[in-house]
Amino acid sequence: MLWPKLILAASLSGLNASDNAPTLAEAPSQPPVGRRVLIPTWELVVPVLSDSTPILEQNGPDSVVLMTEASESPRWLGTIRVVQLNAQSFASATQSYVDGYATSEKNKGHAFLVDSDRAIDGPLGTARAVWALSASPTSQLESLQDAMVGLIFVPFGEAACILGEFKLAAALGDAKQAECERLMLGCTGPTPESLAQERAQQLEEGGRVLEAAQGKLAEFAHTPRWYRHLLRRDDGSGQDFGVTVTWATYGPPPSSLATETGRLGLHVHQQTLTGLGTQDPYSEHFDGWVQDDMGFETFGLNWTKGESVWKSDGAASGLFERSSTNTEYILSAGDLKTAAKRHRVFNGLPSATLPMSLRMLTGKLLVDAEISEKQIRWYAPIMSSEDVALSARRDQVEAFEKGTRVTWTPRQGEPATVDEFDANGVLQRRVFPDGSEMVLTDYSSLVQAWRVAGLPTELLQEGKSRYVKP
């Protein structure tokens, strides 16, 4: 792709302040917008021009929406992103950016002649649109060697702005410029300040949910729960392709923590086999223990890719400890085939840190905390041979039939998973981002379903005899 070489780049750092005041103009009328792109970190919704091919390049706060005309010889392209004002006023920061951009273009031997500089009233405040003629003989797109460059700045809270950089073939004229301005004024989202406050409140709520369960983990113990993994056919029927079984017992800590604590806690076990009958079989085995007051946790996670069997070719582990002065999570993962290892230590964590062992029991946590309609956040481990992270998980909680439905994303920008819990907080159904489902059943019904589907029921029998001994 040509995008990396076509993105118009400049820097806000080290720019001189200048308060040149552009003339004020009325906002262009807003046309209906068909498509939009979300920049997840900022929860900013960006409209998309109708004749474009948009791409979102995610890089946390530096994420960029890229747009170009859907043509073999595009006549325009653009980028939209959020930039910090670096303690400058909106006027001085935008002028510094324009000056820096002009200098950069002239240093390349390109012309940069300002044609118009206007202030435009918009929903987020008074925006600024600068259009300049840019003659760029070195442009890789012949249609853009003689072009108009647009730098459009939209206020975004007290310390940031939304920056749109556009390059248009001069022949497109004023109509396309006005369309780009309308697009920028159509960007919507909470300000960074309100977003930070909202997320802090959601983390506080997540901490309250976990605190409500402290000293009550004996109530979380349960006998084996069996789940069918299903792919939905076109007619709505389900095709079995895997199983998950989980159970929990209450008792003393494992030997690895025997010298650290004598308190009781919850042992959580989970076995998963998926991908049966597909090209991507996968198995997973999890064992964890979390202390009753959630002051300690230890867990081990093993997985196998390419085979649906009760063994592993990858492994991960975690150790969590909360004291009066610090909250720490130590996470490690490795690939037993390649010997690749990852190890990370997280310190100073908030109270809203969800133990890995409770990831299948969040419904019970919400019931105990009497949460049925709310959005909460908590930090939760993400473990694989490719990734070791402690990310801010977001849960949208809502009442559903006789229980609760939770739509959650493991981290910002990733697709959501939907969990449905009954009134007691027991997981009844999980819908994964790919549309597959995990549905609560019983062992006898599961064996029968596998027989009908022609799946190897001996795997179920082996797993039950080897692991399911609560």
Please give the residue ranges for each predicted region.
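N-terminal targeting sequences that direct proteins away from the cytosol to non-cytosolic compartments
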Residues: 3-77, 108, 140-145, 155-160, ...
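Glycine-centered tight beta-turn/hairpin loop motif at sheet-sheet or coil-to-beta transitions
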Residues: 39-43, 71-77, 124, 159, ...
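A short acidic-to-branched-hydrophobic micro-motif
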Residues: 65-99
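Stable alpha-helical elements in mature extracytoplasmic
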Residues: 93-97, 101, 176-183
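Signature of long, low-cysteine stretches enriched in small and polar/charged residues
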Residues: 98-154
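A short hydrophobic beta-strand element
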Residues: 125-135, 162-164, 260-270
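Acidic, serine/threonine-rich low-complexity disordered tracts
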Residues: 167-322, 367-470
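Beta-strand/loop-rich accessory regions of lumenal/periplasmic or secreted enzymes
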Residues: 325-391, 396
